[in-house]
Amino acid sequence: MDKTLEIIKDRINEKQAQLAHAVGEGAAKDYAEYRAICGEIRGLSIAEGFILDLADQMERNNDE
């Protein structure tokens, strides 16, 4: 995987872990905040998927 993409993926994973830990510790003041945090985690997961797809495509293009 490209070094830049690896760094971005790692940062996304770190943020996901921070948010998951915060939810586990009861950081959400109410249900709306809980939903917002869960939405952020979901968005980060989608972004990570895009990065992994891009890295895969870049590797396939380099093989051609």
Where are these regions (language model features)?
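N-terminal acidic leader/helix
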Residues: M1-K29
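Sequence-pattern detector for short linear motifs
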Residues: I12-E14, Q18, C38, S45, ...
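Short, charge-rich amphipathic interface segments used for partner binding and complex assembly
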Residues: A28-E59
